[in-house]
């Protein structure tokens, strides 16, 4: 279980403060206007930002000050952060060993994830030789191969066309279910959120303004629907 208790980040002395509980294996969408604090929330969970106050626990262990490299969390950004001089296999392998010295079991795990992502025939290629969708599959594979209990997505598929975005969302949801991973996904699209998350959190002005069923947001009946421009 992920639990944030009054986690606070001072943005130009304006406090952004979040309290949130997410159960193990749950898939949650994080929605809200631009600049509301959605990415800040993910970066606090991942450890890329150090909170001014509050606490963060994962499965009962305090990770409030744990460095990002030691947190049981993986994060995928819109900019996939692949290394252009490394092959697909090497980029995925970094998720297992930064020195790329993989044993037989790690090699098999890497190839199994690549097959799951449908990129096992691209392992010798460089990122520059791939399409945008293929690069995001590689970046996702690198996250999944780490087998961390929490996966954070910061709009990684927003630049893809609608059909490809739908394909990637389905792939993420299925993979998280198979690995029993907790998923938190930032999105500007309630429709995308509804595809993989039954529960949504709406962030506004550096606070969690609402949380509940995604379908309630879509219907326009939720108190936070208006924040997203949805009317009943």
Curated annotation (Swiss-Prot):
Listed name of the protein: Thiamine import ATP-binding protein ThiQ
- All residue ranges annotated as the ABC transporter domain in the record: 2-230
- Return the NCBIfam families for the record: PRK10771.1, thiQ
- State where it is primarily located: membrane
Q: Which residues are ATP-binding? A: 32-39
Species per Swiss-Prot/TrEMBL record: Shigella flexneri serotype 5b (strain 8401)
Which InterPro entries is this protein grouped with?
Answer: AAA+_ATPase, ABC_SmlMolc_Importer, ABC_transporter-like_ATP-bd, ABC_transporter-like_CS, P-loop_NTPase, Thiamine_ABC_ThiQ
Enumerate the PANTHER family for this protein.
SPERMIDINE/PUTRESCINE IMPORT ATP-BINDING PROTEIN POTA, THIAMINE IMPORT ATP-BINDING PROTEIN THIQ
According to the UniProt record, one GO cellular component term is: plasma membrane
GO MF, one annotated term: ATP hydrolysis activity
The reaction(s) annotated as catalysed by this protein in its Swiss-Prot or TrEMBL entry are: thiamine(out) + ATP + H2O = thiamine(in) + ADP + phosphate + H(+)
Q: How does it sit in the membrane?
A: Peripheral membrane protein
What does the sequence similarity comment in the record state about its family? Belongs to the ABC transporter superfamily. Thiamine importer (TC 3.A.1.19.1) family.
Q: Which UniProt keywords apply?
A: ATP-binding, Cell inner membrane, Cell membrane, Membrane, Nucleotide-binding, Translocase, Transport
* Assigned EC number: 7.6.2.15
Q: Where are the transmembrane segments?
A: none
**Looking at the Swiss-Prot or TrEMBL record, what is one Pfam family this protein matches?**
ABC_tran
Instruction: Respond yes or no to whether keyword Membrane is given for this record.
Output: yes
The subunit structure is: The complex is composed of two ATP-binding proteins (ThiQ), two transmembrane proteins (ThiP) and a solute-binding protein (ThiB).
Q: Where in the cell is it found?
A: Cell inner membrane
**Entry function:** Part of the ABC transporter complex ThiBPQ involved in thiamine import. Responsible for energy coupling to the transport system.
């Amino acid at each position: 279980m992920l639990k944030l208790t009054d986690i606070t980040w001072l943005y130009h002395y304006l406090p952004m403060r979040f309290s949130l509980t997410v159960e193990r294996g749950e898939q949650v969408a994080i929605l809200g206007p631009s600049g509301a604090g959605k990415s800040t929330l993910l970066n606090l969970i991942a450890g890329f930002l150090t909170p001014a106050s509050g606490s963060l626990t994962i499965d009962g262990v305090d990770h409030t000050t744990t460095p990002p490299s030691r947190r049981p969390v993986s994060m995928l950004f819109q900019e996939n952060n692949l290394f252009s001089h490394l092959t697909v296999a090497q980029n995925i392998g970094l998720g297992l060993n930064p020195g790329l010295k993989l044993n037989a079991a790690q090699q098999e795990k890497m190839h199994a994830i690549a097959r799951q992502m449908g990129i096992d025939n691209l392992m010798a290629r460089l990122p520059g030789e791939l399409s945008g969708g293929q690069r995001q599959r590689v970046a996702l594979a690198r996250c999944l191969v780490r087998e961390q209990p929490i996966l954070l997505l910061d709009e990684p598929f927003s630049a893809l066309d609608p059909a490809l975005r739908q394909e990637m969302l389905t792939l993420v949801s299925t993979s998280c279910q198979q690995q029993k991973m907790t998923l938190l996904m930032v999105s500007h699209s309630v429709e995308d959120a509804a595809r993989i998350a039954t529960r949504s959190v709406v962030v506004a002005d550096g606070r969690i303004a609402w949380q509940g069923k995604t379908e309630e947001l879509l219907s326009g009946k939720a108190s936070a629907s208006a924040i997203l421009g949805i009317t009943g």
